[in-house]
Amino acid sequence: MYYDVLKTFIAVVEEKNFTKAAEKLMISQPSVSLHIKNLEKEFQTALLNRSPKHFTTTPTGDILYQRAKQMVFLYEQAKAEIYAHHHYVKGELKIAASFTIGEYILPPLLAQLQKLYPELNLDVMIGNTEEVSERVRMLQADIGLIEGHTNENELEIEPFMEDEMCIAAPNQHPLAGRKEISISDLQNEAWVTREKGSGTREYLDHVLSSNGLRPKSMFTISSNQGVKEAVINGMGLSVLSRSVLRKDLIHREISILHINNFSLKRKLSYIHSPLMENTKNKEIFITMLKSNYQSQLLK
């Protein structure tokens, strides 16, 4: 390629020595000589006045040196601009997120993205896990963030963090004053929960069924805030992410029941369709998602 040949000619003129030019370019001296020979053949003129001890540029060599500097600069500028075009983060990124993630976990990351990439327009749609999966499957979102699992086999799923779940209770509940409880103490309790299709509801159903717990009643509300308000007002217990309860715990509006030798954890994941193009915007988002939360993911 003429770019390499011109760079060789520039190095020879500036170093005034074939050997030094070869060292600078990290190529062999015969390659340097061949490049100069090919240039002289191309332009049908002598570019260098050679002597046993030194050389000088001919008038045509001076012309080529000036133009070669310009051409190399323009080539490298074009290369940098093309790279920037493909790697510059701008445009739109459509994110679908479940309620817990979208309302309590995602906002700090979005603020970080906005600060680093001010020309990136973020379009965040919040719904339950089932709705998020459907949006990604229908290519209405570049990426989805869900709690639990998805039944959409055509989507790719990757965990990005581990979420601590808590059993929330009204402060006046009989179990709230105990340091620890056993899982059997939760038998025949009233529960407040999210709607079907929610990852939080799926997790509660799993906890109840896997431990043989029969609820006295189930009260369904389709928002985390609604569930919390119901618990605060004494309507029952609930299982919610600690991130959802953080402010309520600080203000001591809700109690957490600690179960002896029992851990409540789930994985949060991102999903995307293999049919959707992997854009730079999505790659940047996934990289930041992992760097912010991957340390909280226990393998």
From Swiss-Prot:
Residues 18-37 bind DNA. Keywords: Activator, DNA-binding, Repressor, Transcription, Transcription regulation. Disruption phenotype: Cannot grow on sulfate, sulfite or butanesulfonate as sole sulfur source. InterPro entries: LysR_subst-bd (IPR005119), Tscrpt_reg_HTH_LysR (IPR000847), WH-like_DNA-bd_sf (IPR036388), WH_DNA-bd_sf (IPR036390). CDD domains: PBP2_CysL_like (cd08420). Induction: Negatively autoregulated. It comes from the Bacteria. The keyword Transferase does not apply. Coiled coil: none annotated. Gene3D superfamilies: 3.40.190.290, Winged helix-like DNA-binding domain superfamily/Winged helix DNA-binding domain (1.10.10.10). Pfam families: HTH_1, LysR_substrate. One of its GO terms (biological process) is regulation of DNA-templated transcription. GO terms for molecular function: DNA-binding transcription factor activity; transcription cis-regulatory region binding. Residues 1-58 form the HTH lysR-type domain. Belongs to the LysR transcriptional regulatory family. PANTHER family: HTH-TYPE TRANSCRIPTIONAL REGULATOR, HTH-TYPE TRANSCRIPTIONAL REGULATOR CYSL. Transcriptional activator of the cysJI operon which is involved in sulfur assimilation. Also negatively regulates its own transcription. This is HTH-type transcriptional regulator CysL. It comes from Bacillus subtilis (strain 168). The lineage of its organism: Bacteria, Bacillati, Bacillota, Bacilli, Bacillales.
